Amino acid sequence: MLIAAYLAYLPSVLLLIFTRSFSGIALTMLSIGFAAGIFKPLVFGTVRATTDQTNSTLGFGIFYAMVNVGGSLGPVIAGRLRAISWNYAFYAAAAAIGLMLVITLLFYREPARELERKRLGEKLAEIREALSDLRFAGFLLLIGVVFWIPFWAFFNLCALYVDRSLDTAALYELLRGVLGAGVAGFLSHDEGGARRILGETISHTGYIIMIVQIAVSRVVERFRPIPAFATGLCVAALGFVVLGAAATGRVGLVFLGIFLFAVGEMIASPRIQEYITRLAPKEKAGLYTGTNFLAVGVGAFSGVLYTPLYGRFADAGHPGWVWYVLAGHLVAGLLVLALYQRLAGTMAEQAE
């Protein structure tokens, strides 16, 4: 199935080179989403099948760190290549997919498990069974609203915020003073004779996560899932507040805000996804992970909610205010989550 996912990914990415109409791009992106829908639950299920209660938090942390190697390098490489031609960025993505296919063929080994002899209808019945648990379905919806909407809002808005609302020439000088002209030059471009930081090269968390995720997971594994998740949301909310303050003239705060959001993400995201996966028996881990992506999908509404809101605040001369609203969203969500846990109870993880 991993091979099937790659074979679905590859032509979809290459089609972006030739597609020009809105409908064509939309259909191509749906095809990429279909490939991701195959790929991601398989990987989560593999991690679940090869870990137990003693090492699952670390296992999911390692997986999350590896995901963010791509999350770190991808925006930097794409940012450099799209400055030359968008086609080069798509060629690089296709090459990475081809490399994943080769690595899978050479190194991936199927985890030991009992083979299921179930027909498609029986599998669909299991999905209905999982979602018919109103407490579980309500929890997924709540996680989508409380966490995934602000999460995706960060990635939708941060590069735009940096490029349009901050002094990117001053950001270049700050980076040059700390990391040197070589690194700062790689993360910037020339615009009218001045070096300016490209928003997409710094407005992500992957480079932070791939360095410190495992250490964070080691600390977080000592705590129960929901309190750990709530702590992550609090740290992310603080990051949003700092990001908003960067628009007041202290542009260097954008780096601190991104770092704090990354720490919150490292605490909250792998922990809550591990928790949802461990609500199911090992043989149904992929199924429950698939339902988890329904919560992730709720985050798509961040574009509808927060991108127009940013535009309104920016037009009014207060672009940083959108981050304060996002911080309030997380804090209010924590209160709703606590109320839900009190009324519906905490769902128990499956024993090994």
Residues of each region from the PLM?
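Structural signature of the two symmetry-related core transmembrane helices
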Residues: 1-15, 23, 227-242
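Intracellular juxtamembrane helix-capping segments at the cytosolic ends
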Residues: 38-51, 266-281
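Glycine-rich segments within core transmembrane alpha-helices of 12-TM secondary carriers
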Residues: 57-76, 82, 97, 290-306
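Multi-pass alpha-helical transporter architecture, strongest
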Residues: 99-111, 324-352
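Helix-breaking motifs and short loop linkers at transmembrane-helix boundaries and internal kinks
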Residues: 18-23, 245-249
